[in-house]
Amino acid sequence: MEEQEEKQYNQNIQDNEEGTQMREELQESTSAQQTLQEQEIDYQAKYLELKDQYVRAFADFENTKKRLERDKNQSLEYAYERIMNDLLPVLDTLEKALESAQSNPEAGAIAQGLQLTLEGFLKVLSKHGVEVIATDGEFDPNLHECLMQVPDANKNDGEILQTLQKGFVYKHRVLRPSMVSVVKN
């Protein structure tokens, strides 16, 4: 029986060693699994961080694109405005030439040609957003510049009496105010 006990004892030791080895393998496996789970959590956090950075970078890109488009449009508007301002003295000269030609009876054909040229010029300006400032009615300091005040019993104070030089607006911005005389009783 001793032999049997010894066999049993050896078997128990072997089982114990195998159990210990299995426990160690299980602990290693559990430890490896925990490490993998921690790495997965780290990767998920890194993914979320990178995704957030991407979303922010894309939003910044879109905002920059919109700002550049707006700046480009403003630059074009400013350039158009400067060109329109440069054309106003040419228009003034054309109007004075027309007045001079109309006062000379021998220059009828020239006056007619100047009139057609002036009308065409004004149509082109209008097509591009330039409009003549109206001068009938009340004085508006945003649109008109008063060069003189004149008494007139037939009109109310602040009413425009005479236009001395036409004014123009470009897309609701004053290029040049109308130069007017205003009633002051």
Swiss-Prot record:
One of its GO terms (molecular function) is unfolded protein binding. Residues 1-37 are annotated as: Disordered. It holds the Pfam family GrpE. One of its GO terms (cellular component) is cytosol. The keyword Chaperone applies. It comes from the Bacteria. GO terms for biological process: protein folding. InterPro entries: GrpE, GrpE_coiled_coil, GrpE_head. It is found in: Cytoplasm. Residues 28-37 have a biased composition (Polar residues). Homodimer. This is Protein GrpE. The lineage of its organism: Bacteria, Pseudomonadati, Campylobacterota, Epsilonproteobacteria, Campylobacterales. The gene is grpE.
